[in-house]
């Protein structure tokens, strides 16, 4: 059941988030463009007194944020609706202007079908949307190589260079506000360990040092400075039944300062809580932390029913990896109304923003949630 008192508290916190100016932390998987310096300091317009949920329940939606000049925009791309079937997957897209406080439909993602498992990131003054997979009415699936660049200022899309090895359910991060990293994921041929790097200036791809652990998809993480951290996800089951099981491995990668394709990988100790799948993950340059919330310990395809045939439910554990101390930190081991089936987490100065997702009982939600970054008082 929904804790309405807690939801009221979250609503109040969200209002404070917008009124305070919503200075978005430098974060991954969504990096922000730097505003041009105005002649005189300019303040954001006052925020609306109420923040709406998404227009429709949506899960497995790619999310990102972008700040251009003094305007902060949050985005939700594609995803799966309440029916949790292939025909409930949509190519609709929405943006939220912090000064308005509600969601507006933007130009749909180009293509004949919607996708899930896609990755999104803001770079400079554009949003980039990568890969994902289509679910056909007959039951088949196909991972696509599509890369779309969206210009918020003109509400239009452009096609960018295809992903060399098409992937879905990868970890995404942005380096030096130019290079987008796709870490692992699954392709049409199976789960991959590739790290693929996209240069937004040259519209070109290169391959970086692969991940040394098991190939995984549905893992979570972020890129802060020159450091990538990812956790868990699903890996192929050697016994074959079920086909995929949760991976409990956590890894940190350091990008070579002189060669962006070289990554030194180090295995990390286990994080708080059990191994999980489709956690919401994202990092903060300001905090020097990578945050994680929700997810489930029972991997599934898209409807919330595990590969083992059992229903999946979200985990209540919220935690982070502190890049200064190189240690895991528990924020809340009993987060109210947890969610799963996420493709990213937006980090702000005031908290962690989750957009949509799947609640307990595999219920798709339109809820927009703000979680505290501070550890829960004992």
Enumerate the language-model features and the residues they cover.
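Positively charged n-region of N-terminal signal peptides that target proteins for export
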Residues: 2-11
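Kelch-like beta-propeller repeat domains
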Residues: 26-378
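Intrinsically disordered, low-complexity repeat segments enriched in small/polar residues
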Residues: 11-12, 335
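Bacterial N-terminal signal peptides
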Residues: 12-22
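Small-residue packing motifs within transmembrane alpha-helices
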Residues: 7, 16-17, 181
